[in-house]
Amino acid sequence: MADVKYKRIMLKLSGEALAGDKGFGINPPVIKTVAEEVKDVYNLGIQIAIVVGGGNMWRGEAGAQMGMERAQADYIGMLATIMNALALQDNLESIGVPTRVQTSIEMRQIAEPYIRRKAIRHLEKERVVIFAGGTGSPYFSTDTTAALRAAEINADAILMAKNGVDGIYSADPKKDPAAVKFDQLTQLDIINKGLNVMDTTASSLSMDNDIPFVVFNLNESGNIRKVVEGENIGTTVRGK
């Protein structure tokens, strides 16, 4: 294995990142590029787990506007993450990266059910594992899923790959030209400064299990590899 900072990672991809400029659905050139970026890191010998969101297919707010019950809207969102996971699996395997999808909601015809020990074994056998379906329960975000699964598989770090966002700022840099980018933070810093990075449940899980996470721009080629190799890009948030 190459000289790297993190040997087992949890990569969190937003659904919107797969849509690219289209804003909705899956953009084939974009998901192909994401798969190639993952392969570049995989070739270093890194064990890679992935959680992908579903915002490119379904937003909970859309359900709320329709008067839909929150739990029902969340279940639709979970199915959206599974569609994204299968598409990403197909793109990864088409370029020679062995990949398994595990879902928190059983659908054995298309994916394995989530089993922690089996997921870890896949990683040890040099297979990428994509966790889909969220936690399997409504009211929990895919950020929380990433933090939970990262703790369960003993990941070294969570890589928060953002669509066009290169780190954490003191304010929205698009609205405030005086916004300052942070290179290093702690979870308590995020809470005390009121920074909107991930939901409080995900943040608490990361802090309680002392799992660092790195927020960086997915759209810049090679960034996933740079984070894994320890290059100082984006914002690193320490668990404690």
From Swiss-Prot:
Span list, region Involved in allosteric activation by GTP: 20-25
Subcellular location: Cytoplasm
Cellular component terms (Gene Ontology): cytoplasm
Main location group: cytoplasm
Keywords: Allosteric enzyme, ATP-binding, Cytoplasm, Kinase, Nucleotide-binding, Pyrimidine biosynthesis, Transferase
Top-level lineage group: Bacteria
Chain positions recorded as UMP binding sites: G54, D74, T135, G136, S137, P138, Y139, F140, S141, T142
Pathway assigned in UniProt: Pyrimidine metabolism; CTP biosynthesis via de novo pathway; UDP from UMP (UMPK route): step 1/1
InterPro entries membership: AceGlu_kinase-like_sf, Asp/Glu/Uridylate_kinase, Uridylate_kinase, Uridylate_kinase_bac
Keyword Ribosomal protein: no
Reactions catalysed: UMP + ATP = UDP + ADP
Activity control mechanisms: Allosterically activated by GTP. Inhibited by UTP.
Binding site for ATP: K12, L13, S14, G15, G55, R59, N163, Y169, D172
CDD domains: AAK_UMPK-PyrH-Ec
Role summary: Catalyzes the reversible phosphorylation of UMP to UDP.
Family per similarity comment: Belongs to the UMP kinase family.
Assembly: Homohexamer.
Protein name, as recorded: Uridylate kinase
Organism encoding this protein: Levilactobacillus brevis (strain ATCC 367 / BCRC 12310 / CIP 105137 / JCM 1170 / LMG 11437 / NCIMB 947 / NCTC 947) (Lactobacillus brevis)
